């Protein structure tokens, strides 16, 4: 009888210990979240693309064995000032691409490069002029 209780205590202790370990390994994404402002800028004139309403696609590094994969986090549309404010996870590689009517541009940022409240200028180039 005593050995059965001892075995039960060991099983319960091992279960609680493994549960505690698994919860400690889970990342809290809320502390890695930062807010950035993305500006769509014309490469030739170096001015913001005002009233163009470009599409901004944000992707973050995913799981990949031989090649990196980039999972789509969100798709946003710039406002009349040519910018959009978003929240992203700063602990992963971030790929930001901007596309609009006959324009395309993008950039990739490593972890730790983007800071909270930072403005990011993405230069877009006209596809017709290429």
Which residues are covered by each model-predicted region?
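Sec-dependent bacterial lipoprotein signal peptides
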Residues: 1-25
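Short, ordered, surface-exposed loop/turn motifs in non-cytosolic proteins
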Residues: 43-69
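A short, solvent-exposed loop/turn motif at the edges and junctions
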Residues: 92-115
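Bacterial Sec signal peptide processing site at the extreme N-terminus
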Residues: 21-35
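Short Pro-Gly-centered beta-turn/loop motif in secreted/extracellular proteins
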Residues: 79-95
């Amino acid at each position: 009888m005593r050995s059965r209780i001892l075995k039960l205590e060991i099983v319960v202790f091992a279960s609680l210990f493994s549960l505690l370990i698994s919860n400690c390994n889970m990342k809290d994404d809320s502390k890695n979240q930062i807010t950035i402002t993305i500006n769509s800028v014309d490469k030739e004139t170096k001015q913001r693309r005002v009233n163009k309403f470009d599409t901004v696609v944000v992707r973050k590094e995913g799981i990949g064995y031989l090649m990196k994969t980039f999972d789509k986090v969100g798709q946003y549309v710039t406002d009349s000032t040519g910018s959009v404010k978003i929240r992203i996870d700063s602990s992963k590689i971030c790929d930001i691409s901007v596309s609009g009517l006959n324009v395309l541009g993008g950039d990739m940022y490593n972890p730790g490069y983007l800071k909270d409240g930072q403005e990011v200028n993405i230069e877009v180039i006209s596809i017709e002029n290429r």
